[in-house]
Amino acid sequence: MPPRLPGPQGLRSLTLCLRPAVASPAQALQPLIQTANISQKEKKRKMKQDPYGWAQAQQRKAVNVKRQAELQAQRDAAWGDPVKGITTPFVESFDSAGQASVSPPKVGPDGQLVEEPKPLPTSPHLRNYLLNKDEFDSAIQYAEHILKPIKAEDRLTADPEKEDEEAREHAARHAKAVAALERIAKLEHGGAKDRKHANIRRCIETFGRHITDQSLERPTPPLARGVEPKPQPVRAGPDTGSSEVQIAILTSKIRALSKALEGHGGNRDKNNKRSLRRLCHKRQRLLRYMERKERGSGRWHHMLETLGLTPATWKGQITL
């Protein structure tokens, strides 16, 4: 008969774990997490230990925060607005089509003067209906000449008193007609469409290469090393299709449309808001093209300074 050996009664006395133990990662392999802010308790402890050093640290922090705010304000001002850019006197003169010599004074809500009127560039030679001063004056002189009463060839039978009376009547009628034509052809009495056409002519006169090639010091971009300049053909007429002219025309349209949207009910005008977005994107494409082709030239700097265009108008994404 085999001997009986004592053994454990059941599995209660077993302390073995059938699951494999999860080994904790080594301390050296764990990532280091650094916190920039200390707790309030630590702040109070440091403040009690060294109040003078704590005050100096807070003073340095305040100076740094103030300087960072100033630099951010400068960067924001240099970046500008993607729609309006920086309002220059030439851009502000678009509102009156170059007929107002000073800007309207800005008044606050309490009636106090906020900003003094500034001088604006003018174009007094422009008239309504696509006329200018020379054409208007020549038409008046021609009308006066053909309507002037003719004196009798036979001076023996002529009546001097009647001729003088007819001359006075003609002068009075001519003065009345000239005053009426002046009122009709005045740009101040025109509408938005008339101001748009006048601003287009002003943009051509200001940024057209038939003008800037003669007035700017270095209109074209510098040539690459070893590239010989080629003779350019003589321009046959005014420049109406260059990039700077088209950008100036788009800027005048964008300003008129943005001012209309800022008025009463502009937030509900979805159609004009879409038109404004399309104009801004079209100007952005032209500016990127011109920056690639004309960067460093007098045309590029002259356009940016006159129209007040900032990097926000052609860099990054424009969302309205």
From Swiss-Prot:
One of its GO terms (biological process) is translation. InterPro entries: Ribosomal_uS15 (IPR000589), Ribosomal_uS15_bac-type (IPR005290), uS15_NS1_RNA-bd_sf (IPR009068). Residues 37-60, 214-242 are annotated as: Disordered. Signal peptide: none annotated. Keywords: Mitochondrion, Ribonucleoprotein, Ribosomal protein. One of its GO terms (molecular function) is structural constituent of ribosome. Coiled coil: none annotated. GO terms for cellular component: mitochondrion; ribonucleoprotein complex; ribosome. Pfam families: Ribosomal_S15 (PF00312). The keyword Ribosomal protein applies. It is found in: Mitochondrion. Gene3D superfamilies: S15/NS1, RNA-binding (1.10.287.10). Component of the mitochondrial ribosome (mitoribosome), a dedicated translation machinery responsible for the synthesis of mitochondrial genome-encoded proteins, including at least some of the essential transmembrane subunits of the mitochondrial respiratory chain. The mitoribosomes are attached to the mitochondrial inner membrane and translation products are cotranslationally integrated into the membrane. Belongs to the universal ribosomal protein uS15 family. Component of the mitochondrial small ribosomal subunit (mt-SSU). Mature N.crassa 74S mitochondrial ribosomes consist of a small (37S) and a large (54S) subunit. The 37S small subunit contains a 16S ribosomal RNA (16S mt-rRNA) and 32 different proteins. The 54S large subunit contains a 23S rRNA (23S mt-rRNA) and 42 different proteins. This is Small ribosomal subunit protein uS15m. The gene is mrps28.
